[in-house]
Amino acid sequence: MLGARLRLWVCALCSVCSMSVLRAYPNASPLLGSSWGGLIHLYTATARNSYHLQIHKNGHVDGAPHQTIYSALMIRSEDAGFVVITGVMSRRYLCMDFRGNIFGSHYFDPENCRFQHQTLENGYDVYHSPQYHFLVSLGRAKRAFLPGMNPPPYSQFLSRRNEIPLIHFNTPIPRRHTRSAEDDSERDPLNVLKPRARMTPAPASCSQELPSAEDNSPMASDPLGVVRGGRVNTHAGGTGPEGCRPFAKFI
């Protein structure tokens, strides 16, 4: 009985000691803070410019002055000191080739898509490839990481919390709804695309043969109405070309 109580007291004392140690030595890494597990933007800056690392859908990696939906990242811890960085919108892993160029990939390769994270004395974070030893950088110059060195400015990052409304990450892509090409009423319900009917003379309604020259009528001697000055009796039933009224034909 006494031994059981003693074991309980020892367990309680150990738990209290562990809590006090954690409070005395908090982990200052932004990866393990309150923002861990949420959306993070990696921010880097110089005296002239500032950028947020973003991974596009085509795998291109660059920087944006402000937070964008493509600069929202998920940083997940793998082993001790190693992280995996993923673009939220592009759904691509941040990877590095043997020349130190960073890119986004849909396929995870432990050798190319894992980075070692270290916090510098100035509070900035650096990420370098354990395979190629190059630093993750938005600058053109690619440099390897050496302990105690001063890394280039565009390879030093600060983790910033996401300030973009979450609804921008859930907006569906517009899709074109296709209908049957035979259903004209659904395709153009307001008849906007249909051409309007035009009034054009139908040549067949006015194709009358000219009177024969053997006929003694005035129309026979002057079929075109040149001598008569084009004056014909319009009440005669429209026997001449001037009296022909073409019918409307819709085309």
Swiss-Prot record:
Cellular-component GO terms for this entry: cytoplasm; endoplasmic reticulum lumen; extracellular region; extracellular space; Golgi lumen
**One of this protein's GO BP terms?**
cellular response to parathyroid hormone stimulus
Q: Which residues carry this modification: Phosphoserine?
A: S180
Under SMART domains, the record lists:
FGF
Q: Which GO terms describe its molecular function?
A: growth factor activity; type 1 fibroblast growth factor receptor binding
Known outcome of mutating T178A: Loss of glycosylation
| Tissue and organ distribution | Expressed in osteogenic cells particularly during phases of active bone remodeling. In adult trabecular bone, expressed in osteocytes and flattened bone-lining cells (inactive osteoblasts).
Q: Which UniProt keywords apply?
A: Differentiation, Disease variant, Disulfide bond, Glycoprotein, Growth factor, Phosphoprotein, Secreted, Signal
Q: Which cysteines are joined by disulfide bonds?
A: C95-C113
Q: Which family does it belong to?
A: Belongs to the heparin-binding growth factors family.
Q: Identify this protein by name.
A: Fibroblast growth factor 23
Which species is this record about?
Answer: Homo sapiens
Which lineage is the organism of this entry classified under, starting from the top rank?
A: Eukaryota, Metazoa, Chordata, Craniata, Vertebrata
- State the encoding gene: FGF23
